[in-house]
Amino acid sequence: MPAGRRGPAAQSARRPPPLLPLLLLLCVLGAPRAGSGAHTAVISPQDPTLLIGSSLLATCSVHGDPPGATAEGLYWTLNGRRLPPELSRVLNASTLALALANLNGSRQRSGDNLVCHARDGSILAGSCLYVGLPPEKPVNISCWSKNMKDLTCRWTPGAHGETFLHTNYSLKYKLRWYGQDNTCEEYHTVGPHSCHIPKDLALFTPYEIWVEATNRLGSARSDVLTLDILDVVTTDPPPDVHVSRVGGLEDQLSVRWVSPPALKDFLFQAKYQIRYRVEDSVDWKVVDDVSNQTSCRLAGLKPGTVYFVQVRCNPFGIYGSKKAGIWSEWSHPTAASTPRSERPGPGGGACEPRGGEPSSGPVRRELKQFLGWLKKHAYCSNLSFRLYDQWRAWMQKSHKTRNQDEGILPSGRRGTARGPAR
């Protein structure tokens, strides 16, 4: 039994005897009973169920007078390990008693094997010992419907969790105002505590859902969850996600996808999220403000870098539902790279302004500030990108105009203040 609480039953030899594989089957196939072997004996109580921390007084009584099977020659094993002789005492010539205190939880959900042996090691009788806790009421029930065709729910066993006993969980559901109780049948679909209802679900009518837990020491029932299928809809990840460059812009990528086809016949809205990361990183950056668009431009990216992009969908407002939907899984990653930068880096031979030329430092600083702010956000708003494109167009036009002016002026007067001719 696990060392959750210490007790004499936990003390035993370190190496189990060769009979262990056979003993592990006793509580599954049935422990030996009177008349099952050459030496007949009975263990009492038979297959007890006890709370953790309880004590047990068991006896092994030999029937008849088989040679070598007197009480003085008997001994006990628990899960294949011989128990210390000081835990036993002879009651009479044919009965050996065993006292175990402060029992730990069972090491096997099917019960621990308590076996009475003759002097030569043969098995006389066995009993299954169940030590654990009653179940607590299940909590944290959550459910979702894939494209309004089914319902999947999962839960957690309770605050304490482990009972050390086989505990059966049943998910029950019914229409709120009428109908009979139904029991979910497809368990463990998305984890150990989950169940899937594949069909025959009603829309526009609330359901009541709860979970019942039962084991040898008792039962518990969760609180009732009331939900409408339309309020817990999720869907498949957006298909056909495409990521491409935005012309020669070295810090941007364009992302496009299509709406979930499974919901094309239903009146609903959708919210989308995008996340992206660089090729050699595991950290994702999430873009939340995509709203109901099916395209987005990521900005503030690193030039000459491979990015992985994923998209997911949250359908909401189906048939007028007021509640937010449930996010789908992320789409499969799609990769694309930004163009390499053609601008020289620090110390890379950038031309400094010639003496007397007007410096474009203030404009460059302002642009740098704008781009620095943009890199902190990945905007998917068309207005934001129109503004950004206008900014770039204005800079190019301003630069071109300045170059034309400088080409008209005589070389001696370039960069000087313009004023009325004297």
Swiss-Prot record:
Which superkingdom does the taxonomy of this entry point to? Eukaryota
| Keywords for this protein | Disease variant, Disulfide bond, Glycoprotein, Immunoglobulin domain, Phosphoprotein, Receptor, Repeat, Secreted, Signal
Q: Where in the cell is it found?
A: Secreted
Q: What is an example of a GO molecular function annotated in this UniProt entry?
A: cytokine receptor activity
Annotated Ig-like C2-type domain ranges read 38-131
Positions occupied by motif WSXWS motif: 327-331
Identify the Pfam families for this entry: EpoR_lig-bind, fn3
Where in this protein does the record say Phosphoserine is found?
219
Q: List the disulfide bonds.
A: 143-153, 184-195
Which CDD domains does the entry mention?
Answer: FN3
Q: Disordered: where is this region?
A: 332-363, 399-422
Q: Give the positions annotated as glycosylation sites.
A: 92, 104, 140, 168, 292, 382
Broad class of where this protein is predominantly found: secreted
- One GO cellular component, as annotated: CRLF-CLCF1 complex
SUPFAM superfamilies per the record? Fibronectin type III, Immunoglobulin
GO biological process terms, semicolon-separated = cell surface receptor signaling pathway via STAT; cytokine-mediated signaling pathway; negative regulation of motor neuron apoptotic process; negative regulation of neuron apoptotic process; positive regulation of cell population proliferation; ureteric bud development
Record: disease: Crisponi/Cold-induced sweating syndrome 1: An autosomal recessive disorder characterized by profuse sweating induced by cool surroundings (temperatures of 7 to 18 degrees Celsius). Patients manifest, in the neonatal period, orofacial weakness with impaired sucking and swallowing, resulting in poor feeding. Affected infants show a tendency to startle, with contractions of the facial muscles in response to tactile stimuli or during crying, trismus, abundant salivation, and opisthotonus. These features are referred to as Crisponi syndrome and can result in early death in infancy.
Known role: In complex with CLCF1, forms a heterodimeric neurotropic cytokine that plays a crucial role during neuronal development. May also play a regulatory role in the immune system.
| Name listed for the protein in its UniProt record | Cytokine receptor-like factor 1
